[in-house]
Amino acid sequence: MTTTIKSLKSYKTPLRYPGGKSRACKKMEPYIPDLRDYEVYYEPFLGGGSVALHITKKYPKLKIVVNDLYEPLYNFWLQLQVNGDYVHSELQQLKSKFSDHSSARELFEDSKLKLYDIDVTGKDRAVYFYIINKCSFSGLTESSSFSPQASDANFSMRGIDKLPVYSKLIEDWYITLSLIHI
C-alpha cells in the first residue's frame, strides 16, 4: 500500500453510521489494550467499522475478524473488500450522472427499491447501500428519507475516491454474517 499509516488518520469509516465510533476512537484509545501480543481481534458488531479500521491501522499484522447481522451492511463491507474497484467505479459514474438534488433523490429512491432485490448482484447492492447511507438524513438505510444536504455533503466524489484505500485496508479482514456465540 502506498498510503502510509500516518496519512491514514483521515480514513475513519467510509459510512455514516448511527452510534458510530469514528470520533470516539481517539478518546477510547487509552482503554484499548496493547494488541501486539494478540493473534486475532474480533469485532462482533461491525457497523460503520470505525473501531476495526482503527485497530487495523494501529496493528497492521493483526488478524481481524468482523461480524454484523445486518445483511446489507455485511454485503457492503464484503463487496468493498472483494469488488472494491467495481464499487468505486460505479459510484463515480452514478455521482457524475445524478449530481443535482432532483436526480440524486431519484437515485436514492431507486437504490432503496433495489437493495433487497434478489435479481441484483451483491456488488450492485453494495453500491445501492452506499448511496442510501450517504444520501439519507441520519445514515440509516431503509427507515430514513432523502436529504438534499446529506446528498451534497456526504455523497461526494471525495468520499467515493477514498473507497480504494478502504478496500486495501480491509483486504485481509475475515468478514462474517452470523450470530456470535460466546
Give each language-model segment a name.
Residues T2-K27, Y31-L35, L80-I180:
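SAM-dependent nucleic-acid methyltransferase catalytic core
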Residues E39-E106:
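SAM cofactor-binding core of SAM-dependent methyltransferases
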